[in-house]
C-alpha cells in the first residue's frame, strides 16, 4: 500500500510577526487560524492552504519561496492587485506551459501563484 501525502504547510521566517499577519490578511486574503504572540508564531489560512509564520530575529538573509496553485490565475491576480499586494512579476506563461505571477510578502519571501497548463 502506498501512503498518499495530502497537504503541505510551509513554515516561513518573517521579520515582524504582527506586520506579516496584517499583510497576509489584508493583501493576500488569508485569515488567522492560530496566533501565539508569546511564541512569535502564527498560522494563516486561505481555502486549503495553511502558512506558518514565525518571527526570525537572527538577521540572517535567508528568504523562502513557495508555490500556490490556483484554477483562475487572472481572477486571483486581479484580486491581489486590488488589495495592494506587492506584485514582483505579472502573469507570465512559462516555457513548460504553466501561467504564474509572483508576490513578495513584507519580509521579502516570494509567493508564486501558478495555474497549471491543463486547468
Residues covered by each model-derived region:
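N-terminal beta-strand motif that seeds the catalytic metal site of vicinal oxygen chelate
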Residues: 1-19, 64-66, 114-119
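Short secondary-structure junctions
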Residues: 29-34, 87-89
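Vicinal oxygen chelate
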Residues: 16-17, 66-110
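Conserved short beta-strand elements that form part of the metal-binding/catalytic scaffold
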Residues: 31-64, 110-115
Amino acid at each position: 500500500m502506498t501512503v498518499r501525502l495530502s497537504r503541505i504547510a510551509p513554515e516561513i521566517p518573517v521579520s515582524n510577526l504582527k506586520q506579516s499577519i496584517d499583510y497576509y490578511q489584508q493583501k493576500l486574503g488569508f485569515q488567522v487560524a492560530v496566533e501565539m504572540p508569546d511564541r512569535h508564531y502564527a498560522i494563516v489560512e486561505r481555502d486549503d492552504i495553511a502558512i506558518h509564520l514565525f518571527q526570525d530575529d537572527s538577521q540572517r538573509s535567508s528568504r523562502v519561496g513557495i508555490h500556490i496553485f490556483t484554477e483562475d490565475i487572472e481572477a486571483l491576480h486581479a484580486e491581489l492587485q486590488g488589495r495592494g499586494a506587492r506584485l514582483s512579476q505579472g502573469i507570465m506563461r512559462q516555457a513548460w506551459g504553466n501561467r504564474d505571477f509572483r508576490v513578495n510578502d513584507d519580509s521579502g519571501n516570494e509567493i508564486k501563484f501558478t495555474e497549471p497548463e491543463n486547468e
